Design a protein with these regions (language model features):
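Domain-edge interaction signal
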Residues: 1-191
């Protein structure tokens, strides 16, 4: 196994999970952009679906957000295991894996391989959505999970939609929020 020189921040399992999701996304959706918001949401759903990611998420401007994940991504960019190919990096990102990033996949393969199916499924299901749709879906899912932890059992749809609209205001129409709630319920992501 070839070792890459100069990897200061990203020679760890957390970065390997990020690299795996970026690589899977680039293969599944080669013509789509993978920016900060979408990457956060894909890894949020990977964790929600059982991948043992070391990131914790809290609600933020664009839905569930992890400071730890942002730190890992910044470290990967600094170590050049990940690159941002966007033409206007101040406004948006477009992440791609590098050769050094592929080294992480090889080095941490035994840890990643048991979870590649979940990662692949997350990228397949959610990778085609626009970041704003991912924001809506992930925020709904996050709220259901939070309300479940705070109360007894699964919260009612109306309570989740009400909380969602308190957080997001008028950014999303109530009908769209309700429709996505039902879609998450039917898919089994809300139990």
């Amino acid at each position: 196994m070839k070792q890459c020189e100069g990897m200061v921040f990203s020679d760890n399992l957390a970065a390997a999970y990020v690299a795996a999701v970026v690589e899977l996304f680039n293969k599944e959706h080669p013509d789509r952009y993978l920016g900060r918001t979408a990457l956060q949401k894909l890894l949020y759903f990977a964790r929600a679906m059982g991948a043992p990611l070391p990131f914790s998420f809290e609600i933020y401007t664009y839905g569930p957000y992890s400071d730890g994940l942002s730190f890992v991504v910044e470290g990967m960019l600094a170590d050049e295991t990940l690159e941002d190919t966007s033409q206007d990096q101040a406004r948006y990102s477009n992440y791609r894996i590098t050769e050094q990033g592929r080294y992480l996949l090889e080095k941490y393969g035994e840890h990643l391989n048991p979870h590649k199916g979940v990662l692949r499924e997350v990228v397949r299901i959610f990778g085609g959505f626009e970041p704003s749709t991912l924001e809506l879906i992930a925020t709904l899912h996050f709220l259901v999970q939070r309300l479940k932890r705070q109360g007894s059992g699964r919260p009612q749809e109306e309570e989740v939609v009400r909380r969602f609209l308190e957080i997001k205001g008028e950014k999303f129409p109530r009908g769209a929020v309700s429709s996505w709630y039902k879609a998450l319920e039917q898919s089994g992501l809300i139990e």
